[in-house]
């Protein structure tokens, strides 16, 4: 029983430490989600925690939304074979 508890705790820690992080990206344009208020940012935090993103925390860094605790399935900037195309 103790072994099972230790294994479960280790797997939890590995998942927490190795969680993905990066800039949120708009899949259709390939651009980062922009922001103006640097540091703690309610808009970035809300976007990062949205169901389709799945992050645990978001803030504004270098005028773009940076997310932590993202699942591997969430794309981050830069997208492969797609550059930011603002029109």
Swiss-Prot record:
Annotated function: Beta toxins bind voltage-independently at site-4 of sodium channels (Nav) and shift the voltage of activation toward more negative potentials thereby affecting sodium channel activation and promoting spontaneous and repetitive firing. Induces immediate paralysis in crickets after injection, with a total paralysis occurring within 15-30 minutes and lasting for 1-2 hours. Is also lethal to vertebrate (chicks) when injected in very high dosages (more that 100 mg/kg).
Main location, first listed in the record: secreted
UniProt source species: Centruroides sculpturatus (Arizona bark scorpion)
LCN-type CS-alpha/beta domain boundaries: 20-85
SMART domains for the chain: Knot1 (SM00505)
Domain of life: Eukaryota
UniProt tissue specificity: Expressed by the venom gland.
Stated name of the protein: Toxin CsEv2
Pfam families (UniProt xref): Toxin_3 (PF00537)
GO annotations of cellular component type: extracellular region
Family: Belongs to the long (4 C-C) scorpion toxin superfamily. Sodium channel inhibitor family. Beta subfamily.
């Amino acid at each position: 029983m103790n072994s099972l508890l230790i294994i479960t705790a280790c797997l939890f820690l590995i998942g927490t430490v190795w969680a993905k992080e990066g800039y949120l990206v708009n899949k259709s344009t390939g651009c980062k989600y922009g922001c103006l208020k640097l540091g703690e940012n309610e808009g970035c935090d809300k976007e990062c925690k949205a169901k389709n993103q799945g992050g645990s925390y978001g803030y504004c860094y270098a005028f773009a939304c940076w997310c932590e605790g993202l699942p591997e399935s969430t794309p981050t900037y830069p997208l492969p074979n797609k550059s930011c195309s603002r029109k």
